Regions:
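Short, solvent-exposed loop/turn segments at secondary-structure junctions
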Residues: 131, 225, 269-270
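Intrinsically disordered, glycine/charged-rich C-terminal tails and inter-domain linkers
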Residues: 1-109, 259-355
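A structural signal for short, well-ordered beta-strand segments and their strand-loop junctions
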Residues: 125, 217-221, 261-266
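Catalytic NTP-binding/metal-coordinating core of nucleotidyl cyclase/transferase enzymes
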Residues: 110-194
Length: 355
């Protein structure tokens, strides 16, 4: 009863997406929230903010909306004072349980009306090459084929004990894909998933007729982003989309990837059980070994028996860092990826050397 009443009030505070609920705390008679207009954060974190502390303000907001939105009673007043706003009080007719399970349930509810920030998450981008040149029916077939490759990769990995809780948003001619779970294992598992999707797609292309299976341009990066729930009609959905440094860099990367090419961003991140940050080459080796250790993994009814990186691929003898510059003059580094697989004697090469 109290949760239903809370949901109704949060929906009113949200005002069809006009406002954002930043955080919450228990109160003896209900709940306290900090609710701001959606434009507030842009002004508060602007370099031209009257305080002159735009960057410090942004760091504060990122910390506030990272992880749980649940705060201590005193803390929510401190946060409101820092923002220059007053907490909102939600009066409930019956008390809420303050146990861990209840906190988690309320937190998930609040997040649908909130904005989140993650500092380090793996994201993949699959882009269908020359998509606009195909007939509408072929476009639909190619998107369906890519979706099937993702679902197939998920199913194969799950059977081997690796569950990639992936989410995706469409770009129109492809998808951004990320792991809903956070941490070193989920990040490298997404790379393993990424490689398996590309292998499944390559095998399908070998067998397909022209136009039905897409030629992909693909990129992978680890970085920070914001996460928002999608607003549909009068309700926020349980589905979300991401935007931020990692998606911006992926968009830059994909512009320089040739058809059938694969790029990785120039990142440093944690691998499971590693004591220091590592780059794309170490991530690739980890995912390759993970795939080859899966004795039950079969693609097109064939055992994946070998994966060898090309000499020009990231971490190999002829590898070099590619400088990518977008139309706005913003530059970043990229790593080319290429590898050959063996499916019970059937060789297949993936990736394109970008000179």
């Amino acid at each position: 009863m109290a949760l239903d009443q809370l949901e109704t009030t949060l929906k009113k505070q949200w005002r069809l997406g006009q406002s954002i609920v930043l955080c919450w705390a228990f109160d003896p008679n209900g709940l306290l929230t900090i609710v701001i207009p959606h434009y507030f954060l842009g002004n508060f974190t602007s370099p031209s903010h009257p305080s002159g502390d735009g960057q410090k303000n942004e760091d504060f907001i990122r910390q506030l909306i990272s992880g749980s939105r649940f705060k201590a009673h005193d803390e929510i007043f401190e946060n409101a004072s820092r923002l220059g706003v007053a907490p909102s009080f939600i009066k409930l007719d019956s008390p809420l349980d303050t146990g861990d399970a209840s906190i988690e349930m309320i937190d998930e509810m609040i997040k649908r009306y909130s904005l989140g920030h993650e500092e380090s998450r793996a994201v993949a981008l699959f882009d269908i090459a020359d998509f606009s040149l195909f007939r509408p029916f072929e476009q639909a077939s190619q998107l369906n084929s890519l979706s099937y490759s993702m679902n197939s990769a998920y199913s194969k990995l799950k059977r081997e004990g690796v569950e990639v809780n992936f989410a995706r948003t469409t770009t129109g001619d492809g998808y951004y894909v990320w792991n809903r779970d956070l941490g070193a294992f989920p990040n490298v598992d997404l790379l393993t998933f990424f490689l398996l999707v590309l292998i499944d797609n390559a095998v399908a292309r070998e067998k397909s007729q022209t136009g039905t299976v897409p030629t992909l341009r693909s990129a992978f990066h680890i970085g920070s982003h914001y996460e928002l729930s999608q607003a549909e009609g009068i309700n926020p959905t349980v589905f979300s989309y991401i935007v931020g440094d990692v998606t911006i860099k992926l968009a830059r990367l994909i512009d320089t990837v040739p058809p059938a090419g694969i790029h990785m961003g120039d990142f440093m991140a944690n691998l499971p059980d590693a004591s220091s940050l590592v780059g794309p080459a170490e991530f690739l080796r980890y995912s390759r070994d993970e795939l080859l250790d899966m004795s039950g993994l079969r693609i097109d009814e064939k055992q994946l028996s070998d994966i060898q990186f090309e000499s020009w691929s990231a971490g190999q003898s002829e590898a070099r860092l590619i400088e990518v510059t977008d139309k706005h003059g913003m530059s970043q580094g990229a790593h080319n990826v290429g590898f050959a697989i063996d499916l019970e004697g059937m060789p297949l090469a993936l990736g394109m050397r970008n000179r």
